[in-house]
């Protein structure tokens, strides 16, 4: 069984356009058939912060079963190191640390990462 960490942008796609034919819905369905779908507290904060009151995940995602994990401590260093390397190499985007935290979470837990 393969667990998949689902990135924020995919969830935003599904909330905005739940069309079963969309790439995000189709790919998420395939990942769900292969194993567990996971988000972390960084992803949940990026999604839920847009609402005036914290939504319930099962309502927001229309019954989609997502396991919510805390960010593993051992993801911190590789995320920070990758972020620093990105900036030193001339990376122009400044607010990328959450992306590196999400990616490092997938790596240290051995998850696939679904993003676009």
Which residue stretches match the model-derived regions?
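Short, well-ordered alpha-helical scaffold segment located
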Residues: 10, 43-46, 75
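Short, well-structured N-terminal submotif of metal-dependent ribonuclease cores
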Residues: 1-39, 49-60
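Conserved glycosyltransferase catalytic-site signature
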Residues: 8, 41, 98-100
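Active-site-proximal, substrate-binding regions of enzyme catalytic domains
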Residues: 52-74
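Structured helix-beta-strand junction loops
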Residues: 33-35, 63-67, 109
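Short, flexible loop segments at the rims of nucleotide/cofactor-binding pockets, characterized by
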Residues: 14-18, 46, 89-93
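Helix-loop "lid/cap" segments that line or gate small-molecule binding pockets
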Residues: 46-47, 65
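Active-site neighborhoods of divalent-metal-dependent phosphate/nucleic-acid chemistry enzymes
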Residues: 67-116
């Amino acid at each position: 069984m393969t667990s998949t960490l689902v990135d924020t942008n995919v969830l935003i796609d599904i909330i905005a356009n739940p069309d079963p034919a969309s790439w995000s819905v189709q790919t998420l369905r395939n990942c769900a058939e292969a194993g567990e779908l996971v988000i972390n507290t960084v992803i949940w904060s990026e999604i839920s912060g847009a609402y005036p009151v914290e939504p319930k995940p099962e309502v927001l995602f229309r019954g989609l079963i997502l396991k919510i994990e805390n960010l593993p401590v051992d993801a911190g260093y590789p995320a920070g190191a990758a972020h620093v390397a990105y900036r030193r190499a001339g990376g122009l985007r400044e607010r990328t640390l959450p992306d590196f935290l999400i990616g490092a979470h997938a790596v240290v837990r051995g998850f696939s990462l679904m993003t676009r």
